[in-house]
């Protein structure tokens, strides 16, 4: 029997060759493991880069869709603007006829028309008794009777469409 610590240890050439072969195999596997680890680390970094780029592209797409949704909503709200503008002279004529005759049927028809148009964003601009606002009102005359800077009479009603001025109110303003 032999032991490696004994002085009469004899090297067996077959055992030595097996040990050398196994050592070479272990070194080769260690080198392969290092190579595979390097490949895995590179792949992991590349995956992280691609993932980050994907997140940025996804955020860009979401922002683009939000912008397009807002633009579509604005277009939808204002799509009827020219049609509604064409109705304003008809409403003006009804208002003039109501002033001349106080016809209750005509008042109901005008109110019904305004109610329908309000569903599409049309709102009358308040004028009489209000402080003059050049963004909402157009002064077509002046009077000295009343409080300075206030609107005395509304000659033609103005309207907003979805909070944008469609037509300014034509008014008589008190100026002292």
Swiss-Prot record:
Tree of life domain: Archaea
Family as reported in the entry's similarity comment: Belongs to the GrpE family.
Main localization, broad class: cytoplasm
Biological process terms in GO annotation: protein folding
InterPro entries noted in UniProt: GrpE, GrpE_coiled_coil, GrpE_head
The protein's name: Protein GrpE
Function: Participates actively in the response to hyperosmotic and heat shock by preventing the aggregation of stress-denatured proteins, in association with DnaK and GrpE. It is the nucleotide exchange factor for DnaK and may function as a thermosensor. Unfolded proteins bind initially to DnaJ; upon interaction with the DnaJ-bound protein, DnaK hydrolyzes its bound ATP, resulting in the formation of a stable complex. GrpE releases ADP from DnaK; ATP binding to DnaK triggers the release of the substrate protein, thus completing the reaction cycle.
Provenance organism: Thermoplasma volcanium (strain ATCC 51530 / DSM 4299 / JCM 9571 / NBRC 15438 / GSS1)
Subcellular location field: Cytoplasm
The keyword Cytoplasm appears for this protein: yes
